[in-house]
């Protein structure tokens, strides 16, 4: 079912530079939340210690797809990447003003904004963004490409990838 091939994320940045991220996946011991925290941190150019993944909540990220195999990491991680890309674009003008350079020169890495041969701490950028009344929350979305299924003709590709498994039992009868 193609409708199960989508993911969402809610990203909120606080003026102190801390980040709250909610996604539609379900953590059940596979390390999904740790993976999503790392994706979020990498996308913003900050340390994972600044990111808090909050419990899955359909009031924050509605209509989530099922979490199965690695699809939870792929689909929700891509939604988080979409959200962090939006936020970087939103913060670039703030950082550019602070650094006296072009928005095109701004990059985020090592918990700093860099541009024009200078840098400013992430926390200073987020505080200035808050003072400038820049929205510090975004929603991210992702849908897997190249899928289409015709339920009448029963053909097509309903999922981007499939889960496979195998079980083996060795039995000794006495």
What are these regions, as identified by a protein language model?
Residues 1-20, 24-44, 56-174:
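Cofactor-centric catalytic regions
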Residues 49-55:
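Generic long, charged, amphipathic alpha-helical segments
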């Amino acid at each position: 079912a193609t409708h199960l091939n989508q993911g969402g994320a809610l990203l909120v940045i606080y003026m102190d530079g801390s980040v709250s991220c909610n996604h539609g996946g379900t953590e059940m011991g596979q390390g999904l939340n740790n993976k999503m925290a790392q994706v979020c941190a990498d996308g913003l150019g900050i340390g994972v210690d600044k990111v808090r993944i909050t419990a899955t909540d359909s009031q924050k990220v509605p209509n989530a797809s099922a979490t199965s195999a690695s699809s939870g990491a792929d689909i929700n991680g891509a939604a988080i990447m979409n959200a962090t890309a939006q936020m970087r674009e939103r913060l670039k003008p703030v950082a550019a003003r602070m650094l006296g350079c072009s928005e095109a020169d701004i990059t985020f890495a090592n918990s700093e904004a860099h541009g024009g041969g200078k840098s400013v701490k992430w926390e200073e950028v987020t505080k200035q963004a808050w003072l400038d009344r820049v929205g510090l929350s975004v929603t991210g979305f992702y849908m897997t490409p190249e899928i289409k299924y015709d339920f009448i003709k029963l053909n097509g590709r309903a999922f981007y990838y499939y889960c496979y498994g195998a079980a083996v039992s060795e039995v000794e009868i006495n």
